[in-house]
Amino acid sequence: MYQLGDVKKIVLPGDPIEVQGKMRNGVYRGQDNRYYSEYFGTLQVNDQFVDVVPFSGQYIPRKGDKVIGKVIEVGPSTWTVDINSPYFAMLHMNDTPWRMSSGDLKRYLNAGDYIYAKIMSVNEIKESWLTLKEPGLKKLEGGHMVLIHASRVPRVIGKGGGMVNMVKELTATRIIIGQNGLIWIDGPIEGVTMAIAAIEMIEREAHTEGLTARVESFLKELKGEKDGSQQNKADQ
């Protein structure tokens, strides 16, 4: 199965998509039943989903951003991290809360692990360095990852955090949102499923008015259906 960081190459409009997975954003099916790119951008495979992310809206690293990234390579003193950008990020062992010696990095973070980190510097060619040395920054254990368009992140967060707090409350989940479009969700599977559905709805309808109320109604309806189903099982 492909993972984030396994496939990331530049594609043009009309280029055939020749990887396996569930086609999602930026991909269309031609008359020959093959899949093609809609945009000039990067082909990305995250778990079982295939997306083409246009360069015009792809995440560009900025100093101070908090992002979720996946470790893709472990060196003697640094980790290379995929942050859902055309540019990889680096994390040095001195910028973590752990005391370790060079060459011992895999004990703390190995390839495939996810982290919630802060971008502490970005150079002129967009290479960025991360830190885990602030409260709340950490290795992410368990949970489920959702990838959305980075430009939709403010809509998922909502004014004053209102949207994401409402989703967390109605789904009994914990949610961490990276400004690069990766979102970590943990909790009971029913709640996680509901939260993912809500986030996908927000991404899809981000340009519309009255979205918070519709998402709240959507989640309450889902919750009611699940509660009713559980009650029916208990009565049988």
From Swiss-Prot:
Superkingdom as given in the UniProt entry: Archaea
* Keyword annotations of the record: Cytoplasm, Exosome, RNA-binding
Q: Entry's Pfam families?
A: KH_1 (PF00013), RRP4_S1 (PF21266)
> What does the sequence similarity comment in the record state about its family?
Belongs to the RRP4 family.
Q: Which NCBIfam families match?
A: PRK04163.1-1 (NF003181)
Its assembly, as annotated, is:
Component of the archaeal exosome complex. Forms a trimer of Rrp4 and/or Csl4 subunits. The trimer associates with a hexameric ring-like arrangement composed of 3 Rrp41-Rrp42 heterodimers.
Protein name (database record): Exosome complex component Rrp4
Native species of this protein? Answer: Thermoplasma acidophilum (strain ATCC 25905 / DSM 1728 / JCM 9062 / NBRC 15155 / AMRC-C165)
Gene symbol here is rrp4
